[in-house]
Amino acid sequence: MLKVGLTGGIGAGKSEVSRLLVEHGAVLIDADRIAREVVAPGTPGLAAVVEAFGTDVLAPDGSLDRPKLGSIVFADPDKLAVLNAIVHPLVGARSRELETAAAADAVVIHDVPLLAENGLAPLYDLVVVVDASPETQLDRLVRLRGMTEQDARARMAAQATREKRLAIADIVMDNDVPLEELERRVGDVWADLVHRAHQPGESQE
């Protein structure tokens, strides 16, 4: 098994890269998706979030009001740290369960937005960083996700710097390119990952 940490700044295109890797045959463990699952209605995770931030972060149907919570935590580093302390251990436990279920020769992609921020690089055999210029990130967040420029800049500022992400990268995937070129680059990276997965001693398993 080859454990790959995949990360990138918000708006860099990490989700597109993970989708393409899955098409090639990777096993994906998506931290964002798991983070939503562990705070679903009725979970201990959601109860802990409500205890920390109050019932104002709940939608009328009892689910987590993500935009409301986001507006609180991305404007206050201390509150973001509180949220991360609740969610990250739950995500880690579920991720380990999914990894254990994967085949012995699998390339397991851990899609982890905050890999650099939380010093998680040593957990993986190698780290792939999807990189885009800050201008590209901002454009995608405003144009494609409908964020205000202020909200987009706040979310970018809440993450690790571009330099910090690049410093932990074993492979950097430049995504200031059209989709067709990105698809070609992902194909090349996939071939490299499969080769590494079959090298004796490469995996931490």
From Swiss-Prot:
Keywords: ATP-binding, Coenzyme A biosynthesis, Cytoplasm, Kinase, Nucleotide-binding, Transferase. The keyword Cytoplasm applies. It comes from the Bacteria. Disulfide bonds: none annotated. It catalyses: 3'-dephospho-CoA + ATP = ADP + CoA + H(+). Its EC number is 2.7.1.24. One of its GO terms (molecular function) is dephospho-CoA kinase activity. Residues 3-204 form the DPCK domain. GO terms for cellular component: cytoplasm. Catalyzes the phosphorylation of the 3'-hydroxyl group of dephosphocoenzyme A to form coenzyme A. Belongs to the CoaE family. HAMAP family: Dephospho_CoA_kinase. This is Dephospho-CoA kinase. It comes from Streptomyces avermitilis (strain ATCC 31267 / DSM 46492 / JCM 5070 / NBRC 14893 / NCIMB 12804 / NRRL 8165 / MA-4680). The gene is coaE.
